[in-house]
């Protein structure tokens, strides 16, 4: 029994480092977007892609959630998680086309970004842009794309980010 425990402890420690931490709101003066009446305001000195991502997110914030929605290349009347993330990142010039939550697991570069982070797992994706979370779930009120400062777990997610951001 002791031998088994000695084997399992290092294995558990290794596996504990494989997940990503949950999203936690942190205000950093000059680098964190403001949330005003459900819409995000980019920090003045943020890169142009961050301003564009926030503007795109604001255009669809408050729309309803519909599974499979937002997977065209134009505007839609509702969005699911990957449709909303795709819309925002595509309109910021950071990707082409539309991706599923599973495909976002290979988006951009590995790890947390300085300005934009994509949190993806099979079945769900959400983003943080200049410190605010853009998500279709785990928020108060009805499901659908919206900005929030509310923390959320990210069990099973990988963090990815656009190169340079």
Labelled PLM ranges:
Residues 43-46, 54, 86, 90-165:
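...with weaker cross-activation on analogous glycine-rich loops/strands in unrelated enzymes
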Residues 58-78:
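Active-site nucleophile-His-acid catalytic modules used for acyl/amide transfer and hydrolysis
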Residues 5, 17-64, 140-165:
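Intrinsically disordered, low-complexity
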Residues 1-7:
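Bacterial N-terminal signal peptides that target proteins for export
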Residues 73-92:
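Active-site nucleophilic cysteine motif
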Residues 37-39, 68-73, 102-107:
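Short linear capping/connector segments at secondary-structure termini
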